Amino acid sequence: MIDFWLAAGLLLLIALSFLLIPVLRGRRAQREEDRTALNVALYQERVAELQVQQDEGVLNAAQLDTGRAEAARELLADTEGVEKPRESRLGKPLPFLAAFLVPVLGVVLYLHYGASDKVELTREFSQPPVSMADMTQRLERAAAAQPDSAEGLYFLGRAYMAQDRSADAAKVFERTVALAGRQPELLGQWAQAQYFADNKQWSPKVQALTDEALKLDPKEVTSLGLLGIAAFEGQRYQEAIDYWNRLLAQLPPQDNSRVALQGGIDRAAEKLKESGGTVAHKTVMTVRVDLSAEAKAKTLPSDSVVHLRPRRLRPTGTVGGQARYRR
């Protein structure tokens, strides 16, 4: 911030120069005016002396006229080049008052409407944080400086979760949803923070948030993981396995969290077997759809993908010994 204030001070000096230079010029004009008045007084004194000398008979009329003319020439020579003083309509105190008010008002208005805090935050974020607490403090200052930034609030909520401050994270994610809209990812983060803030007690609020998130996006990973955790804590191991399997299918093959997630699935399967249950494996059917050459010629790479969902056929009766089915 030092370089900023130096630049601001330089601009302020330039602005003050426009106010103070006329005042300095006015003082110079005043000195010229005083000099002119002195010359006039000397001229009048010289003329008076000549008049006294004529009255005493020392000078005749011609000599008097010559003396007056010489004194007048001297007066003109002394006052030559002196500009006529211009009277200021603003008065002398006003420029000094303006020179005082301009910097004061400039600083006050900048501190109120300016963005010095944002400039300082930009400088801070250009340097790597020394700790997680340092990063959280920076994000808190950023959220205070930009309370309408949904992105800043989102990262602040994630930082709170990393520090096990789930109650604070839940409040921040609620504000984020209010600003950015009810996006599935934000709803999932809010539900997760609220669940841990409630000491891992499943509540209708958390259920509503996860339901809404998965309705908008059935692949929303935070909600799937949270539902799996809640099912495992509630000893509903088959549900936990199902949710975590759905989550596992969304993770990239190189994702490091796949190992931990698979360990959770195996742990849930062991618990299910220990309680006398069996792990239900869902049947997966792979369907390959191929287009004819004529159909391929009419398609483009940007065309939408068609999803096929198989449905069980139910018998409706027999005709000629053959069973009839309907969907």
Curated annotation (Swiss-Prot):
GO process annotations (BP): cytochrome complex assembly
Top-level taxon in the UniProt lineage: Bacteria
SMART domains tied to this protein: TPR
InterPro entries given in the database record: C-type_cytochrome_biogenesis (IPR051263), Cyt_c_biogenesis_CcmI (IPR017560), TPR-like_helical_dom_sf (IPR011990), TPR_CcmH_CycH (IPR056413), TPR_rpt (IPR019734)
Cell compartments where the protein resides: Cell inner membrane
Listed transmembrane segments: 4-24, 94-114
GO cellular component: plasma membrane
Membrane topology type: Multi-pass membrane protein
Gene3D superfamilies the record matches: Tetratricopeptide repeat domain
Pfam families: TPR_CcmH_CycH (PF23914)
TPR repeats (start-end): 150-183, 221-254
Keywords recorded for this protein, A-Z: Cell inner membrane, Cell membrane, Cytochrome c-type biogenesis, Membrane, Repeat, TPR repeat, Transmembrane, Transmembrane helix
General function of this protein: Required for the biogenesis of c-type cytochromes. Possible subunit of a heme lyase.
Family stated for the protein in its record: Belongs to the CycH family.
Entry protein name: Cytochrome c-type biogenesis protein CycH
UniProt organism field: Pseudomonas fluorescens
UniProt gene name: cycH
